[in-house]
């Protein structure tokens, strides 16, 4: 082994434990954002036939939960916590069985079928004091005019609306409530 290779191996050996420790310290605290669903079996769209299986329902709810947990953490300051409880979810689009039997399980997205997400939330500071809380019915009448990415994401319109809500109700107050 030549001297350069030996030096490189030594440096990498010294850096690797530090990088691993740094990666561990970046891990987000999952308790900072709590997302729950109040009686999801009664939600407007979760009870629809096309996602009537528990697996289908859980997949949609899990995707919404994961989205909020990952996005909200980027807006929260150290020690702040966010609790979100969904009370209804009505996805963009609807079913049009009058189109024929082959369309019974196809969601048709038109501007008359707006997404609607109803939730309660509470943002608390590191000291435990409430910074912001409330009930919101999130909708966007112009959801079809947005450029929602990625276009292949079946929940792109709902995620856009949730992202707007997080920026307005969480990001601003989170910064103010140091």
Regions of interest found by a model, annotated:
Residues 64, 68, 149-178:
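C-terminal/domain-edge helix-coil "capping" segments
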Residues 73-82, 122-132:
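A short, structured loop/turn motif at beta-sheet edges
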Residues 22-62, 80:
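A structural "domain/chain start" motif
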Residues 50, 132-164:
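Short secondary-structure boundary motifs at beta->alpha junctions and helix caps
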Residues 9-17:
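Bacterial N-terminal signal peptides
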Residues 1-8:
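Bacterial N-terminal signal peptides that target proteins for export
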Residues 86-125:
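Surface-exposed short loop/turn segments
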Residues 62-70, 101-108:
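N-terminal post-signal-peptidase region of extra-cytosolic proteins
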């Amino acid at each position: 082994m030549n001297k350069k290779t030996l030096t490189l191996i030594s440096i990498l050996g010294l850096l690797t434990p530090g990088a691993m420790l740094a990666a561990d310290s970046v891990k987000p605290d999952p308790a900072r954002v709590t997302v729950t669903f109040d009686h999801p079996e009664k939600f407007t769209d979760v009870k629809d036939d096309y996602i009537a299986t528990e697996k289908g329902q859980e997949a949609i709810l899990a995707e919404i939960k994961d989205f909020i947990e990952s996005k909200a953490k980027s807006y929260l300051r150290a020690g702040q916590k966010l609790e979100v409880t969904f009370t209804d979810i009505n996805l963009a689009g609807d079913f049009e069985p009058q189109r024929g039997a082959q369309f019974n399980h196809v969601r048709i997205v038109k501007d008359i079928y707006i997404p609607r997400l109803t939730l309660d939330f509470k943002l608390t500071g590191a000291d435990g004091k409430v910074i912001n809380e409330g009930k919101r019915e999130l909708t966007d009448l112009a959801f079809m005019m947005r450029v929602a990415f990625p276009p292949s994401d079946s929940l792109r319109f709902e995620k856009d609306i949730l992202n707007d809500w997080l920026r307005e109700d969480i990001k601003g107050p989170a910064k103010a409530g140091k």
